[in-house]
Amino acid sequence: MSYELNRKLAAPREPLPTTAEIDQVTADIIRGAFETVCFESATYLGRAASSPIINQSNERNAAIVDAHGRLAMGAIGTPHLTFVNQMETRWGLMNQERYDWGPGDVFLANDPDHGGGHLPDYNVYGPVYDEKGELICIQTLQAHQGDTGGKDPGGFTLEATDVFTEGVIYPCLKLVHRGQLRMDVFDFVVRNNRFATFAGDIAAMIGGVQHAVKMLEDLLCKWGSDVVKAAINHSIEHTEKRMRDEISKWPDGTYEGTVFIDHDTAGTKDIKVHVACTVDDGQLTVDLTGTDDRQDLVGVWNTFANSRSYVMTQVITHLDPTIVRNEGMFNAVEIVIPEGCIAQPPPNKPAALGSFHPACEITEAVCVALSQVAPERAQPQLYKIGMPNAVIGFD
């Protein structure tokens, strides 16, 4: 739990090792298969989950992360979750021996200080191995849960000054070992939640991951591991090229946006989010230097992974929507978030309310900045709602 860990989690990853050569058509067929896997996994969860926030609001996301921790496919679900899944999964991947990874395993994570968003966003994921036992990728499925076992129902506590007030934290917890549900662990997780529907939600997430893992195993059997790895590399490289081609159309320069949160939950006024977007020959740098870093603020701390995700979610709205969502986007966009500011807080700061504010101010500031180079694609911030109103119901 440190800034150093954040740097490790966000560090660029190398392509997968493979001797296979692949053509555009084959690579796109496999990419399409990945998208189908994600769609089926997310749909499985949406239809099997017990809670309305998942089965009606569809606040969930399925994504595939490769064996190096790169986002291989982010396809279906809530947009910002697309870019959070990989960070939380990377923590488990970096510690796979510690957590005894193997075929048939399924894990749970929700830790804001280990690559996660806020506590209610539970990430369930399962590794995918080929017939030789080589790890090829990880299927992830993330969804917002209605409670986290914290002080207040829902996991949102306006006066919280640390994350422990908000609920139970899982850095990486094995739910299924070699295909067998660990009932003691499952019961422990369910018991630390106020809602009876939670058991059905977690069971649905496990099932959605297992369904997708089986589909990916079939894909590996059909095409072979080397070809699938080559397809992942090709797709990521293609996305990076398309990103750079789009960005290179913008005039070089630095474009800035500043947005204020009216006040935090303790009444402190005018909390600043500042963004500087620098375009330089096909490379985009988004720098949040100048964003508020007062340590006594309450209820306005967004996790590093969340902030990184919200930046990218807004950036891609200014680009061709047909570009495939994967790690190639991060290769073309450098994101700078100062350590200690509200967009990358110190360890153990409360995280729940950060997905409202400053998350929406981050996207708004990026939009204000990039509206100077792509005004035809700029959009109003529709997510900027009153935090106490939305969460608790106060007037």
Regions found by a protein language model. Give the residues of each.
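Glycine/proline-enriched, intrinsically flexible loops and inter-domain linkers
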Residues: 2-103, 108-131, 135-285, 289-395
